[in-house]
Structure formats: C-alpha cells, structure tokens
Amino acid sequence: MTTATDLDLERRTIRKLFLRLLPFLFLLYIVSYLDRINVGFAKLQMQGLLGFDERVFGTGFGIFFAGYFFFQVPSNLLLEKVGVRRWIAGLMIVWGFVSCSMIFIRTPFSFYVLRFLLGAAEAGFFPGMILYMKHWFPSGARARAVALFMTANPLAGVIGSPISGLLLVLHIGKLAGW
C-alpha cells in the first residue's frame, strides 16, 4: 500500500530526473545529431579544397548509414554486456576521435572509411539512451521523458546551422573551417 508520503517522494524524484538527468541526455542527443549532419554543412568547403564531387558526398552519406545499420545489433548486444553507462561513454569517445580524424581526409577513400566508422560508433547511441531512460524513469513518466528527449533532434537542426556556419568561417593556422 502506498502512502501519500511515498507518492510525494516518487513525484519529487521524477521531477529531479526531469530537471537534472534529462537535460544532460538531451544535450548528448544534440551532439549526436550535429555530428551526424555536420558534413552536409562542410560539403561546400570540402568540395573546393579536396575536389570531391557530388557522387563522393552521396556515397559518403550512404556509407555512414551502412555502418549505422550493420552495427546497431552488435552494439546493442555489447550494451547489455558492458553496461549502458560505460557503453554510451565509450561510443561518444570513439565518435569524438573519428570526428577529429576528419581533418586528415585527403581522398574519397579516407572520407568513406571515416564516415563508415562514424556510423558504426553512433549506431548504439540512440537505443542505448532509450534503454538508459528505461532504467531511470518509471513507466508512468517514461513516455514524457522520451518525447522530450526526442525534441533534441529538431532543435539540433535549428541550432546546428548557425554553429556550423560560424565554424566554417574559422580558420586556425592552416586548418580549414570544415
């Protein structure tokens, strides 16, 4: 039998989760989405500097999703063995390294390899986040938490354009903005 005190404690705990955990997960999803679409913004400068044509970019976009597709199941199987917290942190570190490695792109092949690796690294992120929320949010609050989490996707599109535009005009040393 639940008492009014128990219900109040549960309500306060859920509120804390929404105020403390969900914004962090939201931010991680924004970073994930921006990382996925950033090459679309960098395309114009990359075309000029590297000489890539539309076919190279189209193939690179497709190869990302091939890596994403092929590594979703293995990533989720590992997620169960390693643990959600460690697995998501590891994925983010790997995709950060892969994203940083984009500065070394000189050929279409290197572009394809890095796009595939980025897709593979990001494959387990979204399912892992949903599982993570399942562990933290009770069933009565989970749908609302996931719905709020999902709004990070369109928000990333809104804030990603200006951020990408600013990054493209930055030139540090001999490094291009992309």
Where are these regions (language model features)?
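Residue-level signature of mid-helix packing/kink "hotspots" within the transmembrane helices
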Residues: 37, 65-73, 123, 157-158
